Amino acid sequence: MKLNKMFLVGALLSLGFASCSKEGNGPAPDSSSTADTHMSVSMSLPQHNRAGDNDYNPIGEYGGVDKINDLTVYVVGDGKIDVRKLSTADLQVNQGASTTSIVTAPFQVKSGEKTVYAIVNITPKVEAALNAATNAADLKVAYEAAYAAFSDAGSEIATLVNNQDQMIMSGKPVVQTILANVSAANASVQNKVPIIVKRAAIRASMTITQQPVNGAYEIKALRPGNVEVGIATVSDLKWAVAQYEKKYYLQQKDNALSPAASFVPASTNDYNGANGAMKHYDYSQLANRITVHQLNAPYSVTDVPNVAYKYVSETTHADNDYRKGNTTYILVKGKLKPVAAMWADGEQAAYQEGGDLFLGLVTGKFYANEANANAANPASGGAGNPRVVTYKAAAVYYYAWLNPNTLDPTTWTMSPARRNNIYNVNISKFRNIGLSGNPFVPTDPDPNNPDTPDNPDTPDPEDPDTPNPEEPLPVQKTYMVVDVTVTPWTLHNYDIEF
């Protein structure tokens, strides 16, 4: 089978569409001597995602603001792979409140059964792989393959361009019999090939509806009898997202499993090292934090255009395979300030703003002086390392999953991050003092491994609340209250208490 490049015929220019295509080394494209009919392709983003995509925390749908640059169509049949790459000048793009549709002008083809593939905003890496196919089988393999999501410069699955989402979109190929002797005028009725595509990326965001007091958020512990007691405040909240797949499937699998779905760490050793999580997941954006967006009312679809977000890739597993070390998370960093009652005698007056905080696990009090904290909080039996957690520069950390399957943190079992969704995590309340650092960044015993991700927020090894990556998702101690929202775009939101 030979690779052909097809051109829209000049007569179609009168319809207001033009095509651009690249010359190939194969035979000439279909012409009036071989083509006996006309066809067109219509593409739409789903008004509803497939079953399961919006099971958790859905609150509505958002049409999006998509930047459409081009549409590439592969028509397979009659021993040929015909390729058309159409610019926006060649397309009719309709963006509505909840969906986007793209329609091509009619073009000439040979009638018969065809398999039609279509990709919006094709990236150079994907285009090179698909165009290298010389037969139907090779094209199918290339279309179902996994590609780098963000690491190939110029071939990222999503970028923000002039406040528009420019991202690759794809869907299942469609097999359809193209009728003979259909004119250009009738092609949209008799020979239209409808294809549903999805955005390959995910949008993640974070908001807070707890109201600040003097610029800070109160951390109120819940005592017996549901009595709230203020123990600290947290301010300067910023978030980042990590542990999403380095690769994505161009064509989403029927079960929506992502390329590293089989990676399930059974121990910390499984998580760390060159063949652990760093091989599969992206941690590169942890230092690029965004301010948590303040809301005065529950998050809704109308807030989507105003809330800053980050792109991530699809990251999923079989239902029983979600672990803390293989699930996409949002990390929140804040500035901790204990209330007067939480300080050991004389320590609050000695503390300098922005300095390290030392929490004694024996006394349950904070210290400005490390030596004082160590002396007052000896290890069990009075020997060994003191039981003190250091909060460097008073920084405190909280984490949340993107799309947990329940609203009760003690019953979380999975958190699938699926393409074409917007996941918003909303902080509704702070209940506890958080962690001393980010526990979910893999390390490597080999200091020369260039792929080891940087962890700008290493936790104190004395922090007893630091979770292990092999643990299932449920947490028995709730640190904040969160609600997450996902948006076609399906929008999800849920509230979380930290």
Curated annotation (Swiss-Prot):
Protein name: Minor fimbrium subunit Mfa1
GO cellular component: cell outer membrane; outer membrane; pilus shaft
Lipid addition sites, N-palmitoyl cysteine: 20
Annotated site location: Cleavage: 50-51
Role noted for this protein: Structural subunit of the minor fimbriae. These filamentous pili are attached to the cell surface; they mediate biofilm formation, adhesion onto host cells and onto other bacteria that are part of the oral microbiome. They play an important role in invasion of periodontal tissues and are recognized as major virulence factors. Mfa1 orthologs from different strains have highly divergent sequences, and this correlates with pathogenicity.
Oligomeric form and interacting partners: Structural component of the fimbrial stalk. Minor fimbriae are composed of a structural subunit, most often Mfa1, and the accessory subunits Mfa3, Mfa4 and Mfa5. Mfa1 interacts with Mfa2; this anchors the fimbrium in the membrane. Fimbrium assembly occurs by linear, head-to-tail oligomerization of fimbrial subunits. This is mediated via insertion of a C-terminal beta-strand from one subunit into a groove in the N-terminal domain of the following subunit.
Organism, scientific name: Porphyromonas gingivalis
N-terminal signal peptide: 1-19
One GO BP annotation of this record: cell-cell adhesion
The entry's keywords: Cell outer membrane, Fimbrium, Lipoprotein, Membrane, Palmitate, Signal, Virulence
Family: Belongs to the bacteroidetes fimbrillin superfamily. FimA/Mfa1 family.
Pfam families the UniProt entry points to: Fimbrillin_C
Subcellular location: Fimbrium; Cell outer membrane
Chief location category: other
Chain segments carrying region Disordered: 436-476
Positions annotated as propeptide: 20-50
Gene3D superfamilies from the UniProt entry: 2.60.40.2580, 2.60.40.3690
Lipidated sites in chain (S-diacylglycerol cysteine): 20
